[in-house]
Amino acid sequence: MHRKPKRILALLALMAGVLAACGGGGQAVPAEKVTLAMGFIPNVQFAPFYVAVEKGYFAEEGIELEFDYGWETDLLKLVGSDELQFAIASGDQVILARSQDLPVVYVMNWYRRFPVCIVSLPEAGIQEPLDLAGKRVGTPATYGASYIGWRALVDAVGLDETDVELISIGYTQVAALSEGQVDAAICYAMNEPVQMELAGQAVDTIYVADYANLVSNGLITNERSVQERAELVQGMVRAALRGLAFTLENPDEAFDISLKFVSEAASDAQTEAVSRAILARSVEFWSAEPGELGRSEPAQWAAAQEVMRQMGLVQNVEDVNAMFTNQFVVEVEP
């Protein structure tokens, strides 16, 4: 398979590394180079991983991490075939991949709350899901996490989809709302509503997670790595969890660290304000109760799979316990 990913070396300076205990003449053992496919462009929303690199958490696990950015459409196929070992992906992608016999495994939960939401302007009078009846709702696409979140929401509240005019608007939610093309739009909570609020535009937001908290982004690997490279998987999960824990406790410092990887996030005062607000909103969706950081819940997976089955995206009900594992999730200190 011919791939030209945009690879950016994430580890700027690896510390001395792991030393072999070979008497007085110990030699440095090279860290293992590992690629993490991000599925998106560089962004402050990846702060936990930037922190884990900068703080040396991956280095302490003997890992030299490389970020592979981009919009790879067959990312989970590459992980399933072991061409890539690790990726950031959402639960719906994992469910779809497993239905296609791709042996991918979700090994660390990142987003505790599903971040898809419905945004409207106050004059639309949309305060709760049932208020969407008779309205025009813009969607980026009729597939993917945004659309699955929408379907889960209308199913959860008993809203008949035929009562809503669903319009494909691409990723133009802000303009579509501001120009009155739609009454509401399906968005990501840390993106469009944040931009609009900082621009002085009041918005009303309905969070899908308040009605159907599906599985969102996490760390993905494959069955072969789980079975044959358990120590590597454990190291990846532990380092990522430490980065996440640090970011939750120190969001301002995490933002400053992120600028070493995404300098354009502070290219001017306005851009920096938006970037800081995006990270602050993201933290709200990553926060977990004590002992829950990184853990997956079977009920969320079952709910997501059922929505996808009703949509016709998957035909059979699979064992959700094969889709994820909590065996590598440990309590960490940042």
Describe these PLM feature segments.
Residues 29-169, 174-179, 183-190, 205-207, ...:
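Short, glycine-/small- and polar/acidic-enriched structural segments
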Residues 228-311:
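Secondary-structure end/capping motifs
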Residues 1-33, 331-334:
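Short, low-complexity disordered leader/linker segments with a strong preference
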Residues 24, 61, 142-165, 239-274, ...:
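Ligand-binding clefts/hinges and TM-proximal coupling segments of bilobed small-molecule sensing domains
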Residues 194:
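Phosphate/pyrophosphate-binding betaalpha-module
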Residues 301-334:
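Conserved C-terminal helix/tail region of periplasmic/extracytoplasmic solute-binding proteins
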Residues 110-120, 197-229, 233, 237, ...:
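Periplasmic-binding protein-like
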